[in-house]
Amino acid sequence: MDEIIKYYNAQNEDDRLTIDRSHELEYLTTMRYIEKACASNSKILDACAGTGAYCFELALKGHKVIAGDLIPSNVKFIEMKNKKQPILDNIYTGNILDLSNFQDDSFDVTLCLGALYHLHDMNDREQALLECKRVTKTNGLIFVAYLNRFASFMNNFTYHPDNFDTIMQEFRTGNKEVFYRSTPVEMEQQASKLGISKLYNIGTDGVAFMYPEQLEGLSKKQYEKYLEYHFDTCEDEHTLGYSLHGLYIGRKQH
């Protein structure tokens, strides 16, 4: 976990989802599906809240939100934002592998939007999902973000074709430094095995990483047309693996 904390201490995570349109897609799509799937006035745990990209917006929409993150600097950032407009129910520093501060069946919705980017060990990945499931009410919703192995290969090969052996090794294992790349099928199988039934499995940013400059060059009207295309196709199982970021949305069965 120290390496993950070190990584995020060196990043400007607060700007990641707004830096350009290719990154904004991930945020817009994730919010679209949270709003689509969640009932109004839900009690939500944002267990990997980062710097608060989702928790504040969800609280403004009337949900009761508790936000936590592994990275102390991220939590401080959330606390500072919340002081300006107190709207979150609670804020905490914590590890997704241990949500023991919360009782079983506490939340209507649990968001795990980042932890699985970094957990290499399959037991840890299962533990994260099990903890999310434990604190979620029966028939409640669990949102799990993951990185896609196929898209990562395309991205790496596009910019670093001379490192093909390394790229292939990363593709076979899914591992690269502090990151782990999954596949849509792997994500579905793991969640299903743990009693989290699939509602949606979507590509949140599609292949936008392949043409960020073209997206930036679109007029507002053209960009709206692109968003329409993206939202129409983001659930297509034939192209899921070619989205850099995936989002599995499941329901707790028991």
Segments predicted by a language model, with ranges:
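Class I SAM-dependent methyltransferase SAM/SAH-binding core
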Residues: 53-98
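Short alpha-helix
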Residues: 178-195, 201
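A C-terminal cap/extension of S-adenosyl-L-methionine-dependent methyltransferases
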Residues: 200-254
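Conserved class I S-adenosyl-L-methionine
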Residues: 1-50, 53, 57, 142-167
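A short acidic, Gly/Pro-enriched loop at the edge of an enzyme's catalytic core
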Residues: 100-110
